[in-house]
Amino acid sequence: MPRGLILATPQLPPDGTPFSARYDDVYHSTEGGLAQAHHVFLGGNGLPGGWQGKRSFTIVETGFGQGLNFLATWAAWRDDPQRCGRLDFVSVEKHPFDRAGLALVHAQEGALASLAEALRQAWPVPVPGVHRLVFDAGRVTLTLMLGDAETLLPQLSCAADAFYLDGFSPAKNPDLWQPGVFKQLARIARGGATLATYTAAGAVRHGLREAGFEVRKAPGFGRKRDMTVAAFPTHWRTRRGPAEAPVWPERHAIVLGAGLAGCSVAERLAARGWRITLIDEHEAPAGGASAHRAAAMHPHVSIDDSVLSRLSRAGNLLARRHWEALDRAGFATGFHPTGVLQLAEHADDAAEQQRIVQALGFPADFIAWLDAARAADRVGAGVPQGGWWFAQAGWVAPPDICRAALAAAGEAVELRWRTRIESLLRHDAGWRACDAQGNVIAHAPVVVLANSLDAVRLAPLASAALKPVRGQLTDVPVAALEDGVPWPRAVVCGDGYLLPRERGAPTVRVGSSFQPGETDPDARTADHAANLRRLAGLQPAHAAALARVDPARLLGYVGVRCVSANRLPLIGAVADEAAIMAPGFRLRGPHAALPRVPGLYAALAYGSRGLTWSVLGAELLAAQIDGGPLPLESELAAALDPGRFLMRALRHGKHAA
């Protein structure tokens, strides 16, 4: 059965009120959507007064619709001189509009036109999962959860201050008003959290009371006599309370490593008002595995929509949105949205690719299958097979991403180049990063390890079994290619990959070898020869010319990447391996948590997907460190947990004494 979303179809009756034929209901009151948003949702939750004087404020909504409640709340936040420092808005939507549909239903909202335009500009490709949108330089976030609320709300990790319940009426859309939904809202509610909804249906009020809310009626909007408001009492406790952020004596972090991982973490924390000390052994950013001139990025796809597929989809789409935002802000990333063609290996593989596309049911602007003729037309050069076309994918020089991130972070980041940290020492409520002589280079409550394999000597990471993987890319002279045969204008991958030719560049780039356990930094003739064979397979029209190339005369790039035992990155708080391995340690209870090393976090093992994980990992860490909704489903965040290998072993009794 297709896993893709069924999109909303915009309909505007003569009175201009957006209407859903699927639910036979309007998206907001016929007496004015903006006025309803102010009366029911802002007024019903005591806003803007409720957020005043707070560092952050989190609102969770059921039923995003056209986004009018979000836009009204964002506008009210902007207009409030006493506003909170950061507004986090989470909304669940089963049937989202696409960008064109939003434009149609937004046409009536002139008062919010500029904010609506910003929302549409950031609007994600409508595929299932969690999508983080960032506005106002990081001070406003919108976390869209696209899919069924009963499935997604249990995966939401946050601490909510207010709730907007705005699905279609309980009579028309009963699934969104079930006891299970209300229990999930109670799970993430802070003590004192407020709730408002336009409906006064008895079943809704009863369900909210059963979940622990204190419920009452209030004057409704327009022709509705009553609406419902509620509060979550401070004395009520659910079995698992909301996910609260740690409390730090100061908002200062040391980040070790200035590659894609470290620079992205620095930028995301800086956007939240943190001060960063960024330390690296090289003399400039991207001095390690992030140093290569160009790299491609595209998602992983599988018939079962695996954890890797879901994570890589989230990472690719978030990175693309974020880099576009940096570009608009004047921090040039150099990302080339050329698209990526992933070739089928043979006819049977082509049939399987088509089956997967049909089964997933995702939009064509995320993934499409093209036969060889259409694929050749799309990339501007002949290809031996058809394949998957990823329209949102492309390529970029990782050092450019690093420089853009640091430029965006600005003075919040103190740069310490050519500096090697020999030890990390706990001191009082923080960490000291020391050199070989014991001198304290920096001290802060938080340390983020983004220094690849070097992290192993500084932190308890034995359970992750981090290993090196050597990769070699080859620069092929343009003069060595078949004369008059076009070169692809998009990334083409299969057995290896090739990148489009940069304007005026004398070479084109092809890769890559994959050699687990190897760290040799010197280029090898045999690997250049293997890359030439890969290129001949991707571009058979150049095969004869490539056969005449002497691989011993070629140049290229060698990088050593870091991978974990299951090839997924390590992103999150570092587990306290010493405490866990102590005799008698047990996990107790179904929701038992691993002990963590206070203030120590990892952004490691990005492997060959550094571009994919960089922004997602940084946004996830920033939320874990500083608070706010996670940008991923909880189960996906757990799949990246640095302590996941220990957790798995403990559950299987392997470390029980």
Curated annotation (Swiss-Prot):
Region (FAD-dependent cmnm(5)s(2)U34 oxidoreductase): 256-657
Region feature (tRNA (mnm(5)s(2)U34)-methyltransferase): 1-233
Gene, per the UniProt record: mnmC
Record EC number: 2.1.1.61, 1.5.-.-
Protein name, UniProt field: tRNA 5-methylaminomethyl-2-thiouridine biosynthesis bifunctional protein MnmC
Alphabetized NCBIfam families for the sequence: MnmC_Cterm, PRK01747.1-2, PRK01747.1-4, tRNA_MNMC2
Keyword terms: Cytoplasm, FAD, Flavoprotein, Methyltransferase, Multifunctional enzyme, Oxidoreductase, S-adenosyl-L-methionine, Transferase, tRNA processing
Lineage: Bacteria, Pseudomonadati, Pseudomonadota, Betaproteobacteria, Burkholderiales
UniProt similarity note: In the N-terminal section; belongs to the methyltransferase superfamily. tRNA (mnm(5)s(2)U34)-methyltransferase family.
